[in-house]
């Protein structure tokens, strides 16, 4: 027996080096294919996983695959969608820990129901909220009930979870800032505040200008002057708006959102207002201005009188 010991030691050493080389290959081997996503179904076995991902690509021998699985304790994997873009060891580590792909759900500043519906259709969400039925709509309008932000989700998450989270955050924010509404602010309800904020949102993206524009609209509401805001007309014409507001559009009494005709705020918000627009509507006071006009450079020029306003219109919009 002793005379065979040197041979046995050599065999064991060779086996050890072979095993080490195999495990090193398992650990370091890069996937030589274009990255793709793969969904691990509940109760998927290791062999099913091998058949589904690796056998078809001839990346690993099954023996090496199984050896690595058991030695590195990858026998339990979690269901979900994974990105297959790295070496086998890292991929299986993600599956063991349940590090599934995370997607973004972005409610854009000032978006509306038309654009939001198209966007939702493009996402890997379970749409259990057709026509926004999971939200308590006001006058069948989702505008003003969701807070623009980025929300994260996993594949096949219920849409209702994201929308209700956004709606809850919007409500909490409005409840908080409503306590800071100045006495001279003429808004009668939180919903009126959201409506006005949605108009401010479409008038400017500048946080500094939003407060000034909000002050103009609050001043008009205070003296019962029509808002005359073009974005409200546009919303009332959607989804068929062709890009131009005509004189006929300005006089259209059938457009419920035509603030050149109606005496006060439109019946619902026209967009999803951001926090800064909500601040500009609710925590703001009427200012000394009644008019503003775009200067063609992304800003606005404000005026106190109609004659002054006409001068600015001729200067900036009739060049």
Question: Which residues does each predicted region cover?
Answer:
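Short acidic (Asp/Glu) and glycine-rich catalytic loops that position anionic groups and cofactors
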Residues: 193-194, 255-259, 291-292
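Conserved catalytic or metal-liganding residues and their short signature motifs at active sites
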Residues: 1-238, 269-276, 280-288, 295-319
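Conserved SxxK-family serine transpeptidase/carboxypeptidase catalytic domain
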Residues: 228-270
